[in-house]
């Protein structure tokens, strides 16, 4: 067990502050997501990106394909809501993608609303462009029952945040250098146009600011890096304490650490990154890169709309009302969050996540994930060359199902 006296003086002070803050902080909003948008002007392939690390009390997530009133779409949903009423991110056949983070300061009362997931579903059903989304916002009955930073992209290269409350919204165009000088923007749980006395998620905003500055400096504003790295960034935004600096000797060297104010927390349920298309490409080449489950125990899989509506079986309802991959990830997560008394439930055992012997859960799934991503990139490249290569995607989905079941069973 990690002892405070074993730490260097400054690290000991900072560690104590993090633990004290974790113990004293009141109830945090559970809908506490972290997001990023990136202009196609700064990605190497010219395709825009929108990313969301989803926090929620509903930890059972999965993906679905739905024929909406106008467009068919891939959606990230709660496992019990596959009809669905609410969708929490995805893209449609017109190349329109959308995600959100709750912004608790936009309506002036600091409260939450019930319409954010409904609006995402309607947008996926009806919208092809940013202008369509703006018309949807303009024509909604008011109050809209929303308080979100909606991130939207389209097949024409459009990409923007919309800080949206019950009566107003403000657009932040990531393609405008006056708005986004480095070609990217970030949001957590406050709007920049809201009442800053009600801001939430400031510590995660500091963390994602640090992460993106470094990614930009290193030329890593790319889909594969962001989907595999943001939710595994374990450096505190305020104290700068990095969990990797507390690397346990082995999986038996139990070291509990408070996860409450990090990007990935106990309440993180899934991750989605929508990779748009260039204006000269088919909207059907839009990709939703998803991590269904806790992102430190599950892996990223690219999802593309097919004519059959097929997706990998392990990220859809497996007949039990849950996703196979999500459930595997939750079981592994229990090994990390093994404490059950009071506020200790937010403390994770780092030795189960990573250690100097390389036997941590995250360390074991990363090579597996690397192969899933590499094979996925190959299949998507074939689709981009010829839209008739959709069978390549479906074959890839079959391979993913078999490959991940084999390796999760062998490893764990």
Predicted regions and their residues:
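Short, charge-rich binding segments
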Residues: 89-91, 142-143
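Intrinsically disordered, low-complexity linker/loop segments enriched in Gly/Pro
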Residues: 117-148
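Short, Lys/Arg-enriched N-terminal segments with co-localized hydrophobic residues
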Residues: 1-9
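C-terminal, well-structured catalytic/ligand-binding subdomain of enzymes
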Residues: 34-84, 89-90, 96, 100-122, ...
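C-terminal segment of classical bacterial N-terminal signal peptides
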Residues: 22-30
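Sec-dependent N-terminal signal peptides
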Residues: 13-22
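An amphipathic, aromatic/His-enriched active-site/gating alpha helix that lines ligand/cofactor pockets
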Residues: 151
């Amino acid at each position: 067990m990690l002892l405070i006296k074993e730490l260097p003086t400054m690290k000991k002070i900072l560690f104590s502050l993090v633990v004290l803050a974790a113990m004293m902080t009141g109830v945090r909003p559970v809908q506490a997501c972290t997001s990023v948008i990136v202009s196609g002007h700064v990605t190497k392939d010219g395709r825009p990106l929108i990313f969301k690390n989803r926090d929620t009390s509903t930890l059972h997530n999965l993906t679905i394909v739905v024929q909406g009133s106008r467009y068919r779409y891939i959606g990230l949903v709660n496992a019990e809501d596959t009809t669905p009423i609410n969708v929490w991110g995805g893209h449609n056949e017109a190349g329109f993608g959308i995600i959100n983070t709750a912004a608790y300061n936009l309506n002036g009362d600091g409260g939450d609303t019930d319409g954010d997931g409904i609006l995402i579903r309607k947008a996926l059903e009806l919208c092809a462009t940013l202008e369509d989304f703006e018309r949807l916002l303009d024509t909604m009955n008011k109050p809209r029952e929303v308080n979100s930073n909606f991130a939207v992209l389209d097949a024409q290269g459009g990409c923007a945040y919309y800080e949206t409350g019950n009566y107003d919204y403000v657009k932040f165009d990531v393609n405008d250098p006056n708005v986004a000088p480095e070609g990217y923007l970030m949001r957590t749980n406050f709007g920049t146009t809201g009442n800053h006395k009600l801001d939430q998620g400031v510590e995660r905003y500091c963390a994602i600011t640090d992460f993106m500055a470094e990614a930009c400096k290193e030329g890593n504003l790319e889909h594969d890096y962001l989907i595999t790295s943001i939710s595994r960034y374990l450096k505190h935004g305020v104290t700068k304490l990095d969990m990797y600096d507390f690397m346990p000797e082995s999986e038996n060297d139990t070291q509990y650490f408070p996860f409450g104010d990090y990007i990935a927390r106990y309440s993180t349920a899934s991750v989605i990154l929508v990779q748009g298309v260039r204006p000269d490409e088919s909207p059907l080449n839009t990709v939703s890169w998803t991590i269904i489950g806790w992102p430190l125990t599950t892996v990223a899989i690219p999802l593309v709309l097919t004519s059959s509506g097929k997706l990998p079986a392990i990220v859809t309802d497996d007949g039990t009302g849950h996703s196979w991959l999500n459930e595997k990830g939750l079981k592994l997560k229990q090994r990390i969050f093994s404490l059950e008394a009071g506020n200790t439930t937010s403390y994770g055992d780092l030795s189960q996540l990573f250690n100097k012997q390389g036997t941590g859960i995250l360390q074991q799934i990363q090579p597996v994930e690397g192969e899933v991503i590499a094979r996925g990139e190959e299949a998507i490249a074939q689709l981009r060359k010829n839209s008739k290569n959709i069978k390549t995607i479906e074959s890839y989905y079959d391979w993913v199902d078999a490959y991940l079941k084999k390796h999760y069973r062998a490893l764990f």
